[in-house]
A protein has these predicted regions:
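A generic structural motif
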Residues: 137-142
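N-terminal catalytic or cofactor-binding beta/alpha core of small enzyme domains
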Residues: 1-108, 118-131, 146-163
Length: 164
């Protein structure tokens, strides 16, 4: 099992802060995405060539305490849908008392762009990676980052258990 965990840079970006924490306790590959359309697209495409089984991309969503699973990305009128199965992750997060929502709008900015580029690159190169995009609240709307970290860590451990 090979897992990539990605998120956008930024000292106050909750995705970056979550990745910093994950990096300390897990051995997964971590990718800090630049806050730039072209650079982040190239970064994710280069990493996808390493044939990950699962790719978890995190972004932050303002004005909410909920966690959102993005099911598709739309760019220039083209819609791409992920084949990532969110069910086990949803159950895991709900066990930690998080409200989890399915979303069909990854936004109009960097999150949607990198998700679209990843899905498109997967499709064009016939890759097997399962790609997820997860929007988490901004840092001021996360009550306890360690609690969120524990839920993500448990989920990753479960992925490895399922593989056995």
């Amino acid at each position: 099992m090979k897992i990539l965990i990605a998120g956008f840079k930024g000292d106050d970006n909750s995705a970056k802060i979550l990745l910093d924490h994950i990096k300390k306790i897990c051995n997964e590959d971590i990718l800090y995405l630049e806050n730039d359309f072209e650079i982040s697209s190239k970064q994710i495409e280069e990493k996808l060539l390493e044939n990950y089984d699962n790719v978890l991309i995190f972004g932050q969503k303002p004005n909410t305490t909920n966690i959102y699973f993005e099911n598709n990305a739309i760019l220039e009128g083209k819609k791409l849908v992920t084949d990532y199965y969110y069910g086990a992750l949803k159950e895991n997060l709900e066990q930690y008392a998080y409200q989890v929502m399915n979303s069909y709008d990854a936004g109009k900015y960097l999150c949607n762009n990198v998700f679209f580029r990843a899905l498109n690159f997967k499709q064009e190169n016939n890759l097997k990676s399962k790609i997820a995009f997860i929007h988490i609240p901004t840092i001021d709307n996360i009550e306890d980052m360690n609690h969120l970290l524990s839920s993500i860590k448990d989920y990753i451990e479960n992925l490895y258990e399922e593989e056995k």
